[in-house]
A protein has these predicted regions:
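Canonical Rossmann dinucleotide-binding motif of NAD(H)/NADP(H)-dependent dehydrogenases/reductases
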Residues: 3-33
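The beta1-alpha1 cofactor-binding region of Rossmann-like NAD(H)/NADP(H)-dependent oxidoreductases
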Residues: 39-40, 58-71, 105
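Active-site loop immediately N-terminal to the catalytic Tyr-X3-Lys motif
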Residues: 97, 155-161
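Residue(s) in the substrate-gating loop at a strand-loop-helix junction
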Residues: 150
């Protein structure tokens, strides 16, 4: 897909891999909507890339209403969505059984919620928007969705059970 003139939603787009993706898409002539919880970093990216090319939306990817509001902001600002890159993610190291007892289930649940459920929440809403516009190229595609995984999906590391499981779910 030619990125020039296309609109992308990038989750976790204010830092790390998501920030690099945001810069790359904007550098290729795309418009980027950053979904992130870090408002200062998100606004800094808008200042760097320019408000004509970039929009920040404070979105909790796990929360359906928050994600819907972000999608609505993207469509309102740029008309549609052609690309969705899901980079939002967290990792909390904890052993299955540590000195203080078994792996805390609230930690497990939060990592799975953000990394796996949050990814699906945003991609399904982006897909709904993509399905409404005309194909963007000769093969009939209406958009592209990229979900960021990790080698941890295949090679678990000590203390990374939840992270590995969440990335395995993405794969």
């Amino acid at each position: 897909m030619d990125i020039n003139g296309k609109v992308a939603v990038v989750t976790g787009g204010a830092s790390g891999i998501g920030q690099a993706v945001t810069r790359r898409i904007a550098g290729a002539g795309g418009k980027v909507v950053i979904f992130d919880l870090n408002e200062d970093a998100g606004q800094a990216m808008v200042a760097e890339l320019g408000a004509d090319n970039c929009l920040y939306a404070k979105v909790n990817v796990v929360d359906e209403d928050s994600a819907k509001a972000g999608i609505e902001a993207a469509v309102s600002a740029f008309g549609t969505i052609h690309i969705n890159v899901n980079c939002a993610g967290i990792g909390n190291a904890a052993k299955t059984l540590g000195r203080d007892g078994p792996f805390p289930m609230d930690v497990w649940s939060k990592v799975i919620a953000v990394n796996l459920t949050g990814t699906f929440n945003v991609l399904r809403l982006c897909a709904e928007v993509m399905a409404k516009h005309d194909p963007v190229n000769d093969d009939g595609s209406r958009g592209v969705i990229i979900n960021t995984a990790s080698v941890a999906a295949y090679e678990g590391q000590m203390g990374q059970a939840a992270y590995s499981a969440s990335k395995g779910g993405i794969v």
